[in-house]
């Protein structure tokens, strides 16, 4: 409740984040509807806390280039739902995060996660991360910086065809290309 949020907000190590008003798939909204949804939540934050959070987390980790642009105009940072370690090479409007919850939150896993190294990359394609009929399957290419720890041991997994499996990858020195075998199923 808001009293608990206000209590947390007083702690010096806590940042309250924005996650939309409806917690629906923003990519399914018309442009004006997703903007209204964000603005509704922002109005509530301003009324209850006296400010709008600087952090945004995309509901279900989904966003389009248009949504990302709106968020980048109104927030300082945003998080997807892809796992990874934040470092200086990451786009501050596509930050990775690890789920820590009742299913994925035991102490052993937490200790493992805080000791991970980031995969630092120069280029990540495609720019439009939202998969539609016209770009399914996407062509996914990552160009890494050189001299990274264990980079040759990289593996990728995807749920193409609605079943999780190890992805086909080509890894040539520092460029990784994912060659998806099947189209992704839509929800």
Question: Where are each of the predicted segments found?
Answer:
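Generic serine detector
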Residues: 20-22, 42, 57, 64-65, ...
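Weak global preference for isoleucine
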Residues: 5, 16, 35-38, 44, ...
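Metal-dependent polysaccharide deacetylase catalytic core of the NodB/CE4 family, i.e.
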Residues: 1-66, 89-96
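Active-site-adjacent pocket scaffolds in enzyme catalytic domains
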Residues: 1-17, 68-129
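Glycine-centered structural positions embedded in regular secondary structure
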Residues: 48, 78, 142-146
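Terminal accessory/targeting
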Residues: 23, 97-187
């Amino acid at each position: 409740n808001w009293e608990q949020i206000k209590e947390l907000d007083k702690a010096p190590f806590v940042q309250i984040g924005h996650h939309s008003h409806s917690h629906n798939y923003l990519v399914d909204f018309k442009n004006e509807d997703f903007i209204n949804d964000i603005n509704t939540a922002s109005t509530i934050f301003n009324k209850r806390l006296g400010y709008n959070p600087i952090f945004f987390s995309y509901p279900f980790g989904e966003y389009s280039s248009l949504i990302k642009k709106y968020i980048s105009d109104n927030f300082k940072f945003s998080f997807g739902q892809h796992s990874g370690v934040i470092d200086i090479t990451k786009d501050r409007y596509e930050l990775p995060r690890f789920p820590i919850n009742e299913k994925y939150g035991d102490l052993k896993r937490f200790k493992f996660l805080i000791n991970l190294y980031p995969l630092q990359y120069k280029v990540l394609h495609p720019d439009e991360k939202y998969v539609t009929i016209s770009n399914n399957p996407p062509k996914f290419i990552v160009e890494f910086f050189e001299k990274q720890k264990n980079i040759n041991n990289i593996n990728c997994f995807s749920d193409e065809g609605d079943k999780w499996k190890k992805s086909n990858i080509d890894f040539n020195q520092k460029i990784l290309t994912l060659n998806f075998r099947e189209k992704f199923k839509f929800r």
